[in-house]
């Protein structure tokens, strides 16, 4: 009986546990009969990779505040891909890439790649494809279908925003096949063309960041942002000379950080900006939106929220007076590495060593040989990999007054390494300067030291052992590109269908050593002036001293917003060329104070009365009236230097018009024959707008040359008119050669006279020696 009761209890307990066990063991998925709808629903949420589709909005978007401001940006390949923007992906060079950044105070919530590409009609469908990577993560695959062959194809691919970082690289990899067996990767039928109108659609959302100066200059300048840095400057009213100097220092420092991106500094008087901005305020003069801020007892730099928008930040430069603001500005330019917290007090900025001429950080040093490692702008710049390695480029920013006329060449000591060719062939390294070929060197198949002592020809031909190589005259400008191309003769498979030879191609690797050097230390500084091209390309002659310590800027009394904007944009542009702020710039509003000064003069707004009658001025813009001098013969090309007779002023024309106009003129300083004056003039607010646009636009600056640049709605017209003067120093024999270089007939006459005189002297000397030898008693 007890045994029966035991079994009954055991069965009852087992039945009570069974339902809970069944609940835990139930499969997470639905039964097989319902699996197909579930998979379909999942496919709708996560589209199948490789599908050419319109893209899903908001997929994988990061979680951010819903009420934050956002902006939509379309980045075309024409903007962010290497020039010209389009890409031709081939069998031996299947990769192409674009790069873009993301500001640290923003996050991407949506991203979509829009492709416009044309595949070769010889490709095998489906087997050929385009793989898309973001930061080396595979985002998707676009297969080439039969209908797409030889036709322009439009496709979209969504990008997961979670993979987007501060710096991003989208890499396209072409996998192409044109036959099933015995393919040649170098076949000309293997290609896929990606159009320059392809692009990337991004939605950025702004983050509400803390007021913390330890991240400075973010958010006022973010190196991850490839756009022109537009940074308004806010004043209580027309600034005094001291405040003009302080704001110029800040603008030049931000210009030195902006570099190739460009910069723009809109000026506001007692207005609230609508974006991140710099505000200057003293205890007595401050914008109305800061009237309740407590007075300060020292130079203070503080980061605050915009009164109406917490997503916008203001950097307020406070001081008791303009002297404090000047000290605070120097603190921004030279002491920002110590910034932290919401505010800092600038106690002292003390210079320890004076700057030297031509020591701008962005310029190649001319006092000693420079290593290529010093010229690098990013890691891995001096190396390349691939079946056909991409070219290695080195930028050389030089002072525009470097005198190379009688130079025999520029010495380079190149140390390089490369993947050795398997056999001795015609693989080589080509060296070019400013897209002009210099020389090539064979790549040996033997292990040996690869070091070259090369002299870049500047104006003379290059002698290479057995052969005279004819080199066109190479003219170095302010910005130069030195390029190394490694050309490999890669063995490729071949054969027939029945007897096919195949193997896996191996990438080649090339490296230019960081210890390679180039030497510009043996050359003089000498340049004919006026030359607005030197100003437009390098900020010369003001940039000769990187801190602008030998520059005086003459401003109007009580300048308006447009005139202040011209000052800030000009010094910002010069800072971008030199890489150093204008901490020692002198600003004045009294034109009489420049008399007798040993300094280069920058005039903004209007030429002082004492200079208006100077015979060297070739353009004057004043209100609705303007006049200009035109030369006897005008040359349309900047590189052609006309004769003195062609430059002579033939006519002076005076006109009156209500249309806007601006101009830039250069002439010799009447107070020092080694100094120059450059004036930036405009006749109206629209004229200043065109002038600022020309200063900020590198393409428009490239059209400036000579002594006069007239800026109108139609564009910029430059003239070479008036006298030439020379700035710099040459030894007397170099100066004589320079003077005779443009007068070959006179040079030939002088050479003939010199030969005759030398022959006569030698003849007389030989007669004296002969007479003494024949008549020793007459000594």
Cite the ranges covered by each PLM segment.
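Hydrophobic helical h-region of N-terminal Sec-dependent signal peptides
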Residues: 9-15
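Bacterial N-terminal signal peptides that target proteins for export
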Residues: 1-9
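Solvent-exposed alpha-helical segments and adjacent loops
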Residues: 26-779
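C-terminal segment of classical bacterial N-terminal signal peptides
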Residues: 15-24
């Amino acid at each position: 009986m007890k045994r029966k009761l035991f079994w009954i209890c055991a069965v009852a307990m087992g039945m009570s546990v069974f339902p809970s066990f069944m609940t835990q063991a139930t499969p997470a998925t639905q039964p097989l009969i319902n699996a197909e709808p579930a998979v379909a629903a999942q496919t709708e949420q996560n589209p199948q990779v490789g599908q050419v589709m319109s893209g899903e909005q908001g997929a994988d978007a990061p979680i951010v505040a819903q009420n934050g401001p956002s902006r939509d940006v379309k980045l075309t390949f024409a903007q962010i891909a290497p020039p010209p923007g389009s890409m031709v992906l081939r069998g031996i060079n299947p990769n192409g890439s674009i790069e873009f950044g993301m500001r640290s105070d923003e996050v991407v919530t949506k991203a979509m790649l829009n492709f416009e590409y044309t595949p070769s009609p010889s490709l095998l469908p489906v087997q050929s494809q385009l793989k898309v990577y973001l930061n080396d993560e595979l985002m998707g695959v676009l297969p080439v279908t039969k209908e797409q062959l030889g036709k322009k194809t439009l496709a979209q691919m969504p990008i997961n925003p979670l993979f987007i970082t501060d710096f991003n690289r989208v890499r396209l990899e072409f996998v192409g096949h044109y036959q099933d067996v015995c393919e040649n990767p170098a076949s000309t039928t293997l290609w896929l063309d990606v159009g320059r109108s392809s692009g990337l659609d991004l939605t950025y959302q702004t983050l509400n960041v803390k007021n913390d100066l330890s991240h400075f200059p973010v958010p006022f300048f973010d190196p991850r942002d490839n756009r022109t840095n537009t940074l308004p400057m806010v004043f209580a009213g027309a600034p005094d000379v001291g405040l003009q100097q302080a704001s110029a220092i800040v603008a030049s420092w931000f210009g030195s950080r902006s570099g190739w991106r460009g910069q723009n500094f809109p000026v506001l008087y007692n207005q609230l900006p609508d974006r991140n901005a710099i505000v200057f305020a003293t205890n007595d003069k401050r914008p109305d939106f800061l009237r309740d801020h407590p007075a300060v007892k020292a130079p203070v730099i503080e980061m605050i929220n915009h009164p109406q928008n917490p997503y916008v930040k203001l950097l307020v430069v406070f001081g008791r007076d303009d002297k404090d603001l000047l000290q605070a500005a120097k603190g921004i330019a030279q002491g920002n590495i110590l910034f932290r917290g919401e505010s800092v007090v600038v106690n002292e900025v003390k210079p320890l060593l004076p700057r030297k001429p031509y020591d701008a950080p962005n310029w190649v040093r001319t006092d000693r040989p420079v290593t290529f490692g010093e010229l690098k702008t990013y890691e891995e710049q001096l190396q390349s990999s691939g079946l056909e390695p991409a070219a290695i480029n080195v930028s050389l920013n030089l002072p525009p007054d470097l005198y190379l006329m009688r130079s025999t060449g520029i010495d380079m000591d190149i140390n390089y390494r490369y993947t050795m060719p398997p056999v001795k062939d015609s693989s080589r390294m080509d060296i070019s300067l400013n897209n002009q070929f210099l020389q090539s060197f064979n790549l040996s198949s033997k292990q040996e030291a690869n070091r070259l002592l090369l002299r870049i020809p500047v104006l003379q031909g290059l002698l290479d052992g057995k052969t005279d190589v004819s080199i066109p005259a190479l003219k170095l400008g302010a910005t130069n590109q030195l390029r190394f191309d490694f050309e490999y003769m890669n063995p490729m498979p071949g054969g027939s269908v029945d007897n096919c030879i195949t193997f896996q191609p191996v990438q080649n690797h090339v490296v230019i050593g960081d210890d390679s050097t180039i030497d510009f230390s043996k050359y003089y500084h000498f340049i004919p002036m006026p030359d607005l091209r030197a100003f437009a390309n390098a900020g010369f002659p003001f940039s000769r001293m990187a801190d602008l310590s030998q520059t005086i800027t003459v401003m109007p009394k009580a300048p308006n917003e447009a005139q202040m904007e011209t000052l800030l944009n000009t010094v910002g542009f010069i800072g971008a060329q030199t890489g150093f702020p204008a901490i020692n710039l002198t600003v004045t509003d009294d034109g009489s104070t420049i008399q007798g000064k040993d300094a280069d003069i920058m005039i903004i707004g209007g030429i002082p009365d004492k200079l208006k009658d100077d015979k060297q001025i070739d353009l004057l813009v004043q209100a609705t009236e303007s006049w200009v001098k035109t030369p006897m013969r005008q040359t349309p090309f900047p590189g052609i230097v006309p004769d003195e007779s062609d430059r002579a002023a033939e006519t002076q024309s005076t006109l009156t018009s209500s249309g806007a106009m601006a101009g830039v003129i250069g002439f010799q300083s009447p107070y020092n024959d080694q100094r120059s004056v450059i004036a930036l003039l405009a006749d109206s607010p629209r004229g200043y707008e065109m002038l600022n646009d020309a200063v900020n636009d590198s393409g428009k600056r490239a059209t400036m040359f000579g002594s006069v640049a007239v800026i109108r709605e139609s564009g910029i017209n430059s003239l070479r008119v008036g006298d030439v003067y020379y700035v710099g120093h040459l030894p007397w024999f170099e100066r004589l050669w320079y003077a005779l270089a443009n007068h070959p007939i006179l040079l030939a006459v002088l050479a003939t006279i010199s030969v005759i005189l030398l022959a006569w002297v030698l003849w007389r000397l030989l007669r004296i020696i002969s007479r003494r030898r024949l008549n020793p008693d007459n000594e």
